[in-house]
Amino acid sequence: MITSHTRRTESSALLTAIESENAAIFAYGVVAAFSNPARVNEVATHTAAHRARRDALVALSTDAGETPPTAAAAYEIPFPVTDAVTAAQLAAQIESDTAVTYRAFVEQVDTDQLRTFGIDGLTDAAIRGAGWRSALGTAP
């Protein structure tokens, strides 16, 4: 049974996920600026994946009658990024933060479509994060 509380919770989950993806896209811009040149394609692919998920979330939000948030001009980076190592650390943090968002998303939505979307987002972020942690020599 879908109630108004359920709709508000799903709406909140969608809007939070959009914000998380907007922050990830911004942070990947910082990663790109400091990354090892050998990782340029990987960074571009990950950025594109976050854009695609954000765009899908915006469409889902709009279809639900919500007004999706626009991206902020800037987002706070959790630590200074000054070289390729700190850029990779930021990328790992981006994916960890995104995974946390999708974990909460799955708990807050009630439709199979949205749960599947959240599980896919969680899985994708976990895989990307494991790749970055592996590149850093830390255990996934």
Describe the residue ranges of each PLM region.
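All-alpha RGS (Regulator of G-protein Signaling) helical domain and cognate RGS-like helical scaffolds
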Residues: 1-140
